[in-house]
C-alpha cells in the first residue's frame, strides 16, 4: 500500500481557466492565487505584473502565451471544506496559441470558462469551447467584468446557450450592474453576498435578497432546482413532493449533471473589483471533478493491447508531458500530469515513444514563476521535472516494468512560413541552438532548411506566433535575426484516380538494378491524410521491398506534383509488379515507387490547395461598408453577420495568402476601432488563375 497522502485524491482539482483575450482571465487567476493565500500582492495585467504571465513578452503585450501550472489550496469561503488542492493550468486565449489550449485541455479534469459581461461569447470562446467538448471537459462559466459599462449577465447566459449550444444554469444573479454592481445573489442559499472592499474581498456579509429582485430570484431558482432534480429519479420525486430541495441536494444534483457534461453552472462577478472569485473557488470544489471522477486514462500496453490507468497511488506510475519550457536558472523544465502511481526524485522512468530510459533529477512544483522543490509526486499531481533530455510534448513517461503509451496529442500542421537569417556570423551558431530549443517546446512550430536556397525556414500557426518566436530568440538567446516575407504553406492533391507503372532498370557491368511496380493513386476526403496499401498477391513483389516503395512514394509526395508543395489526402495502393532474383534491391524499388507516383499524380488532375482562415471582424457600423468591401477584395466569402455591443460582427472565410498585413489595413480603414481574430479553418482548392501564378512563381 502507498503511504498516506497529505490531501486525498478526491480533494484535488486539476482545472484550466479558459477565455477570450480580454475577458479578464489573468486577473481572475491572480485573484484566485491571492484568496488562496499564495500571492500577497495582487498583480494587475494593466501594470504588467501579473504572477501567471511570466514571460517578458506576455507582460508587454498583455496577453498570456505559456500555460504555467500553479498549485494552491482552498478551504472554502466559510472554511466549510477540509483542505482542497487546486492545480491551475493557465491557458492562452489568443488564436495563434490554440495549440497551447489543446495541450492544457488534454491534462485537465475540469475548466472555468471566463466570459466578459460586455463582449459575451466571442469567436475565440467558441474555438476553445469546441476543443473542450472534444476532450469532454466539464466546465463552469464565470461572467466577469460585471462592473463595466454595458455589462449584461443574462445576455451572456443566452449567448452560451445559442452560440455554444451549451445548457447554462445560473446559480447566482448579479445585484446591479456597471458601476452599481454591488454583489451577487446565491440562488442555492437564497442570500445576497456583499464582499468587503476594505480587505479586498477577503471577508463578506450575507444579507436578505433585495425586495425588487425577489420575483426574478424565484424564477431562476426554480430553473436551477429543476436542473438539479433531473439528475436522478430520487431527487425528482423529492422535488415533486416537497416543491423544493435542500442546498445539499441541489449541489449534489448539479455536480452530477456538470460531471456528465449536461449542464454548465454559471456564476458572475468582477475579478478586478474583488467580487465573486471567492464563490467561484467554492464552485470549483462543489461542481468540478477530482481525478477519481473522470474515466481512467486509456493507452496502449507494451504488447499492443488496449490498457488503462486509473487515478490511484497503488497503480504503476504513468504520466503525460504536456509542456516543455526553457528556464534561465535550471535549464529545461518538463511539465507533466501524473495519472497513476508515485514518482520520487531520483527514480528512473521510461519513455515508450522514444524507447529511452531517463532518470528524474529534481521535481518542482510551480507557483507561477517561483518554485518549490518536492520529493515526490502522486496520482493527480501536476509538476515539473528538471533535466529530461529526450521527452517532448505529448510523450508518456512511465514505470519500466509496466509500460503504457498514453494516447498522443494531435497537433495542427503549420500554415505560414518565413525565411530567417542571422544578422552576424556570431548569431549563426546561436540561432540553430535557439530554434532547436524553441521547436522542442512548441510542437506547432517547425524549423527546416530549404534544400534549394539553403535558407532556414520557420513555420507556425500565424504571424503573431512567429513574431513571438523571433522575439524570444532575441531576448532569451541574444540572437538577432532578419526575417523574410511570410510565405503560405500551400499543399497539392489530386482529383481523380489513376493507375501507373514505375519501372527502374539499370543493366551495367556487374550487378544491375531492377524494380517494377504498378500503383493505384486515388484522392481521399479533405483532411484524411495519406494511406498506403499493399494489395500484392502471390508475392510478385517480395514483402521486404514494400516499405521501400512506400518510402519512394512519400519522398516524391514531399516534392509535390506541379508546384513543389507537399501532396496530401491521397491513397496509394501497390497492386502489381515484378522483380529480379539478383538485380532487385530496396533502392531500385524505392526509385520505381517514386517514378510511378510522379508520373501517375501528374495525370490525376493535380490541384493546388491553399489554407483558408476563419476570420471574425468586429467593427463600428460606420466602417461596415469599407470593411466588407476590403474583405471581398481579399477573396473573402462572407458567412454571416451579427450584432454585438462592440459593433457589427462579420464572419468570413478568407485565404491566408490575402491576409498578410491585415492588422495594419484594418486599423487604417476603421481609424483603429475595428478588431479581428483569425484561425486556420481548412485547405481548399485555389482558383486556377491564382494556382497558375503560384506555379509560375515556384518554377
From Swiss-Prot:
It is found in: Cytoplasm. SMART domains: EFG_C, EFG_IV. It comes from the Bacteria. Keywords: Cytoplasm, Elongation factor, GTP-binding, Nucleotide-binding, Protein biosynthesis. GO terms for biological process: ribosome disassembly. One of its GO terms (cellular component) is cytoplasm. Residues 10-292 form the tr-type G domain. Belongs to the TRAFAC class translation factor GTPase superfamily. Classic translation factor GTPase family. EF-G/EF-2 subfamily. This is Elongation factor G.
